[in-house]
A protein has these predicted regions:
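Short, Lys/Arg-rich, polar N-terminal cytosolic tail immediately upstream
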Residues: 24-31, 35-76, 333-337
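N-terminal secretory targeting modules
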Residues: 3, 28, 32, 467-558
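Residue-identity detector for glycine
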Residues: 11, 32, 37, 48, ...
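N-terminal acidic, proline/glycine-rich, low-complexity intrinsically disordered segments
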Residues: 1-19, 23
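Hydrophobic membrane-embedded alpha-helices
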Residues: 3-5, 14, 67-82, 86-509
Length: 616
């Protein structure tokens, strides 16, 4: 049974008989050479010394081979950056509200699977090298990788909203702390905020919900894996545990989804989304070479047939004259299925099917469909695994295509693009802008997002990831330099930080709360109310008295809203006689629909019904 590597190396292990000679461990072949005796071309040496050296070398080589087999190799896979590019492009297209990319929100699912896969590869590689997981070091690396860019985006967005859009500043105020502390998703759930239905501009920090789920995974998964390693749980059993947890999470999404309610609880929840990360983690336990076509045939139980076709062996693995004697037991020709799974094309077919499936889901699904929550997100995760399997085979067609330099370039900056695109696109495309945006403006907006992301990647993420902050602090401690001298040497950086902080903090402190109906909309209503004739106002008052309680006959206009609608009650009643506002703080669309059904049952819903929900 395959185990996690322990601190003490084991002795050499002989390759299975059904394994092809070229697949046997190097140490086994060396041991075979030693059994045949020294080469006549070598200088004779002491036999005892030679045997000892041979055995020691075989043991070391076998132990090294075992570790290499037990862990995924720590190597850079450029095709995975190409897959990141496809994911972030899907998300950006979705937030541009393009009708042919309403399923672009599935790009986040692709990110989840990739994150679970790559993080688990790193952890398994560390276990293979050291036999343990340094949790403190892991979390410090995650903080250096993620937090500097997050803090920058939050404060720059505050500054931009202070200058350009006070409604967005009001929306993002309560989201700042949850975003910085990575519990944004649970905050949105607690506030009953819909991801899909919002009146007016949403919070520019809404997209931080996915970062929160990833950080929560990084907080819980490494200790859990370390615990299983410490308890010497075998790799097959660990894989079963991971797959079981993923199944529970996927089932939770299906069970908790209610077609009659807003799906945001299921969409935001860590418990209902973590299966994508866990499926990626599960795949990380499979060595890259086991995803090669011949090894896939082995896992499918086709290895003997594949070996027969390739090496001319019989069903019992014999060759030569014995193979001729047993020819009756060996198949004359391998089946088409065997030939397919043994060919390099098989893994590319999996990858292409995965890519086509993902593209179809982006084009044909959206966040409202029941399919999305009753198997669609799970299917997206499985399709992503198929693409990853093709990406880790560097000679494959899919891997070469996704390793194209432009795709890799964008993929390396996908985290920055994801962070910056949402607030920038919201500021450039506010809800109040009802004019059609020409295609060339969208292109300019995307180019601006990429330019800002490049600056963030080059001047914020990369220096922090490479330890620039730690080195600067060390210089302060050693007395090599002082904060004042450092500031004089980095005047542009300090000036930019100071300007952003002053504007952002000034906006948070001094700009009053502003809502979609408390600004220009409220001014229009108040102006109209003042211009209303006294006779009309008296008629409205008389009508309101008749409407107290639930009057006979329906309202001419019924408005069902949340707390923002309450602010317009006085002006609304003056402008629209025989009308009624039913407003409640924190009300969302599912509750608004139930309220509306109540008015229908009492014959009070008139010809015009206004829903003003999702603003808070």
């Amino acid at each position: 049974m395959e185990q996690f590597p322990q601190s003490s190396p084991r002795g050499p292990r002989r390759a299975p008989d059904n394994q092809a000679p070229h697949e046997r461990p190097r140490a086994d072949r060396r041991t075979g050479e030693s059994r045949r005796g020294p080469s006549p071309h070598r200088t004779p040496t002491n036999k005892g010394s030679h045997a000892a050296k041979t055995n020691t070398g075989a043991t070391r080589s076998s132990a090294t081979d075992q570790q290499a087999t037990a862990r995924p190799k720590s190597r850079y896979i450029p095709a995975l950056d190409g897959l990141r590019t496809l994911a972030v492009v899907a998300v950006v297209l979705y937030h541009l509200n393009l009708t042919w990319a309403q399923g672009g929100l599935l790009g986040v699912t692709i990110f989840f699977v990739l994150s679970g896969y790559l993080i688990t590869r790193l952890l398994l590689n560390e276990v293979a090298k050291t036999g343990r997981i340094d949790l403190k070091s892991f979390w410090i690396r995650r903080i250096r990788r993620l937090v500097p860019a997050v803090v920058t985006v939050v404060f720059v967005t505050c500054a931009l909203c202070t200058i350009f859009n006070h409604v967005m500043l009001t929306k993002m105020r309560p989201d700042i702390l949850p975003s910085l502390l990575f519990f944004n998703n649970w905050w949105q759930i607690a506030q009953n905020v819909s991801y899909f239905n919002a009146l007016g501009d949403p919070s520019p920090l809404t997209h931080f919900w996915s970062l929160a789920i990833e950080e929560q995974f990084y907080l819980i998964w490494p200790p859990l894996l370390f615990a299983m390693v410490s308890m010497h749980v075998s790799k097959p059993n660990t894989r079963r545990v991971v797959l079981g947890l993923a199944a529970v999470s996927a089932l939770a999404m299906m069970v908790l989804y209610n077609p009659a309610a807003d799906p945001s609880r299921v969409y935001y929840g860590t418990d209902t989304r973590v299966f994508s990360l866990l499926l990626g983690a599960w795949m990380a336990f499979i060595p890259d070479r086991d995803l090669a076509p011949v090894r896939l045939a082995h896992r499918l139980g086709l290895n003997r047939l594949a070996g027969t076709a390739k090496h001319g062996k019989n069903a019992e693995g014999k060759s030569g004259e014995k193979a001729d004697e047993s020819a009756e037991t060996a198949p004359a020709q391998p089946s088409a299925l065997v030939r397919f799974w043994s060919s390099p094309a098989s893994i590319d077919v999996l990858g292409v099917v995965g890519l086509v499936g993902l593209a179809a889901m982006v084009a044909l699904t959206n966040g409202y469909t029941a399919f999305q929550y009753r198997g669609g997100t799970l299917l997206c995760s499985i399709l992503t695994l198929m693409v990853i399997a093709a990406c880790v085979q560097p000679q494959g067609m899919v891997a070469r295509a996704l390793s194209a330099e432009p795709l890799v370039w964008v993929g390396k900056r996908s985290y920055s693009i994801y962070l910056w695109h949402y607030p920038l696109l919201l500021l450039m495309n506010p809800v109040a802008n009802i004019n059609d945006t020409p295609w060339w403006q969208y292109i300019l907006q995307v180019l601006l997002v990429v330019a800002v992301a490049e600056c963030s990647y080059r001047f914020i993420e990369t220096p922090f990831r490479k330890g620039a902050f730690g080195r600067t602090v060390a210089e302060f401690r050693d007395g090599t330099t002082t904060p004042a001298n450092w500031a004089r040497a980095h005047v542009p950086v300090c000036a930019a930080c100071a300007v952003v902080l002053v504007i952002a903090l000034g906006g948070l402190i001094f700009v009053p709360e502003t809502s979609a109906l408390s600004g220009e909309g409220a001014e229009v209503l108040n102006k109209e109310a003042k211009n209303t004739a006294p006779a009309d106002q008296q008629a409205a008052d008389d009508t309101d008295k008749d409407n107290d309680g639930f009057p006979d006959g329906s309202y001419d206009l019924l408005m069902i809203g949340d707390s923002v609608s309450l602010r317009a009650v006085d002006s609304f009643d003056g402008v629209f006689p025989h009308s009624h506002i039913d407003a409640e703080k924190g009300r969302q669309f599912d509750a608004g629909r139930a309220t509306f059904e109540g008015y229908i049952q009492q014959n009070l819903a008139g010809k015009i019904v206004v829903f003003a929900l999702g603003t808070n």
